[in-house]
Amino acid sequence: MNISLGLVVICLLWQRDIRQWVTLAGHPLVWLPALMFVLLALSLLTHAHAYGPKMVGKYQKLLYVLPLALFFLAAPRLMTHFVRGFLWANAVILAISLTSGLGHVTLGGLNPDNPTVFKLQITQNVFMALAALVWLSRAFACSGKRRWGYAGLVLLATLNVLLMVQGRTGYVALAVGMGVWLLLTLRRKQQMAVLACGILAIVMLVMTPNRAMERLSLGVQQIQGCIWAPAETAYQACDNSMGQRTAFAREALRLIQQSPLLGNGAGSFWYGNPSTGYGVHNPHNEYLLETVQSGLLGLMVFLTWMWSCYRAAWRLPPAHRNLFVAVLSSYMACHLFNSFLLDSSEGHLFVIIAALLAGLSLNAQQPQRTSPQT
C-alpha cells in the first residue's frame, strides 16, 4: 500500500491542471476521510497501543479518494470500466459458486455446503448482494432479452446469497439495498405490489426450512446465550459469531465511557483470552470502532462523510441517484455488523464509491459554473 500511495503522489504531481485537484481536495467527500485518517494518526502521539501503527496503516486507504476521483475526472470511461469489471467478476464468482453448491464440486478446496469462491464468505455475500442490486437496476432499464438476462442474474445471485453462502451480512446488504432501491424507483402502486410479494416471500422463508432462516435463528440464539450467560462462563458462552459481536459491543461501550470525546487512540480496542492467546482489535461495528478510537469527534466526522455521500448521490440524475443511495444504505446497515472501512476489500470498494461520487458531483457542477460565461 505504501508503494501505491507513493505512485499516487507522483500522479498528483504529474497532474498539470492544479485547479482541478485543488477543487477536489476541498470537496467534503475527499477531505472528510482524510481528516478521519489524520485524527487516527495523531492519536499515536498521545496513546501507546501496540496495535496502533498497524491500525493506522489499515485506514491509509482513506487517502485514496482524491487520486481515484482525479482519475475518474480525467477519464470518465474508467467509471464504466470499473462497474463492468465488478459485474463480470461477480458473474464468474456466481457461476463457480453455483457449480460447486449444486454440483457438489470440491475442486480447488471448494465446500459445496458453503461455496465461497472470493476471499471470505462475508465479503463474497456482500459483493454479490451489491452486484444483484446493479443487475436489478439494469433489468428495469433494459428491455427484451437483456431484461430477462439481468433478471435471471438477479434471481441466481439472490438464491446464492440467501440459500448457499453462509454470510448473514449479505442478507442485510441484499434486503436493505433492494428495499431502498425499489422504494425510490417504483410508483406507489408498484411499491404496494412489491411489498405484498416481499411479505409473501418472508412468510415462505419462515414456514419453509432453509439455510437463511437457520442462520438467522442461530444468530438470535447466540446473542441470547451471550447476554444471559453468568460471568463465570461468559467467555465460553460468547465464543461464536453473534455472541462475540455482543461481547465486542460490551467492551467497546466500556472503552467509550473511559474517553468519550477524543477516544482511546488507534488500536485501543482489544477482546480476547490471554490464556489461549486469542485476541482481536476489531469490534465488527464501524460506528463503535470509530467512537472507541477517535471518540465522538471521530464518529461525527465519519457520519458527516456518510451524509455528504448521500447528499452528493441525491443530486445525481434519478437512475444514478437511486442506485448510489441504495448502495450507501447497504453499507450503513452493514457497518452495524462489520467494520467495513477497516476491512480491506469492503473498505477499498467504498473508497472507490466515494471517489465515483466526488467525480460525478464535480462533473455535474461544471456546466453550472460555465453557463454564466456563455
Where do the PLM segments sit?
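Transmembrane alpha-helices of multi-pass inner-membrane enzymes
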Residues: G6-L12, F324-C334, L341-T374
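Aromatic-anchored transmembrane helix interface
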Residues: P28-V38, A50-L73, H81, G85, ...
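Hydrophobic transmembrane alpha-helices and their immediate junctions
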Residues: L183, Q190, Q293-S330
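A membrane-periplasm/extracellular boundary helix in multi-pass inner-membrane enzymes
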Residues: T185-A234, R250-Q258
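Alpha-helical transmembrane segments of multi-pass inner-membrane proteins
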Residues: V9, L78-G109, K119-L186, V194, ...
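Transmembrane signal-anchor hairpin modules in multi-pass inner-membrane enzymes, especially those
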Residues: M1-L42, A50, A74-T80, R84, ...
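Long extracytoplasmic/lumenal interhelical loops at the membrane interface
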Residues: A234-S294
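Hydrophobic transmembrane alpha-helices of multi-pass, membrane-embedded glycosylation machinery
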Residues: L5-L13, Y171-L183, C197-A201, W307, ...
